[in-house]
């Protein structure tokens, strides 16, 4: 049976349209790679803009809830964290009735701890005391960076869609630390952490920042 010429031309036209449609819908690997690169560059731009604003912060204060969970111990406390001067940080852990459990000062070359009995410890003794109290060799020199949502010396990082830190992977004294930022205070400019989880092996520290204030 012969196909009329006008139908034959119509079939050819429809076939070409179908082929063109298929070629449009078929992912092009180079296009995918370009989209991924564009997305990564966008995240990097957001991150560097955010980091620049955070690094300009000084003389701040935050407070909230502290939880430490391990196989053998669970501790809950209120906490106050403060940047007193350029390189002077203070962490106070309080029990639920407001009495200080730990008063910790961190300065370049100096760590001072006052425990709940009023006993003072300096440097190596202070670090040893913290390890006894928490069961952790806590990287104090990184802590002030992590609290602000900065990576410190860590280079293994992931970001959320807003360009803020989402996860940090860090090695310290033979220990592997994972820091996860669960949420941020989006009402702040720049946005600052709202909930942080700091995990080392079976040890977990949770920080819930109720508020931030800048002086």
From Swiss-Prot:
Covalent lipidation (N-palmitoyl cysteine), chain numbering: 22
Signal peptide range: 1-21
Membrane topology: Lipid-anchor
Domain of life: Bacteria
Principal subcellular localization: membrane
Keywords annotated in UniProt: Cell outer membrane, Chaperone, Lipoprotein, Membrane, Palmitate, Protein transport, Signal, Transport
Lipidation (S-diacylglycerol cysteine): 22
Location(s), subcellular: Cell outer membrane
Listed GO CC annotations: cell outer membrane
PROSITE patterns named in the record: PROKAR_LIPOPROTEIN (PS51257)
One of the Pfam families matching this protein, by short name: LolB
Signal found in the keyword field: yes
InterPro entries found in the cross-reference section: LolA/LolB/LppX, OM_lipoprot_LolB
GO terms of biological process kind: lipoprotein localization to outer membrane; protein transport
Function: Plays a critical role in the incorporation of lipoproteins in the outer membrane after they are released by the LolA protein.
HAMAP family (UniProt xref): LolB
Subunit structure: Monomer.
Family to which this protein belongs: Belongs to the LolB family.
Name of the protein in question: Outer-membrane lipoprotein LolB
